[in-house]
Amino acid sequence: MKKRRKICYCNTALLLMILLAGCTDSKDGEAQQPSNQASAVQTDEKHTEPEESTKIRKDEAEPITESEESATKAANDTSSAEEKSKEDNVLAAYSSEKIEYARVWLQLGPNQEIDELNVRHIAAGEPINPNDDTSASYPENVTQLAGSRLVDGSVTYHGNGDGTIHVYNVPLRWDSADDIEKGVMREVTESIIKNRKTVYVDTGDDEKIKRLIDIMMIH
């Protein structure tokens, strides 16, 4: 009888130990599962953070890229406009001096139907009438424009560099000094200096100016 009780106690104790062991394993499993879930969440956060960071950097870079593209487009537009302006300007290949000579003749030249435009420079101090020793002298450098024929007339002027010129009413050909009384030439040439006119030069028609430049002869 005692032996049976002893066996019964042993079986009961063994059963309790098995039950306790099962409960312990269950608790360990439950504890491990949240830990695994937490690790998974942390892993997802690690993967998410670089993506968000990359997206932010990309968003920040976009305005800079657009700005650079705008600047490049503006530069290209400006360059195209400058090239078109040069193509449209038929006088771009000519010097400002030649353009000035042509503009002055186009505005003041007595005859526009000329086959040649002669340009001659006269220094200050040179006599207005080179054929008369009593002639007054030019007070400033002047330029004389004339056609190839006497009937074409002439224009004698000084460029002021501000869009205006001083015009001297000087004939292309003077009468012989023998035909003029002594002292008269002095009065005539001094009167030319005194009565010089200031004239504003118009820009004129580019095609007509180009034609005059093409037949220009500078001496």
Curated annotation (Swiss-Prot):
The keyword Cell membrane applies. Residues 43-61 have a biased composition (Basic and acidic residues). It is found in: Cell membrane. Residues 1-22 form the signal peptide. A lipid is attached at C23 (N-palmitoyl cysteine). PROSITE patterns: PROKAR_LIPOPROTEIN. The keyword Cell membrane applies. It is a lipid-anchor. Residues 32-42 have a biased composition (Polar residues). A lipid is attached at C23 (S-diacylglycerol cysteine). It comes from the Bacteria. GO terms for cellular component: plasma membrane. Its main location: membrane. Keywords: Cell membrane, Lipoprotein, Membrane, Palmitate, Signal. Residues 26-89 are annotated as: Disordered. This is Uncharacterized lipoprotein YdeJ.
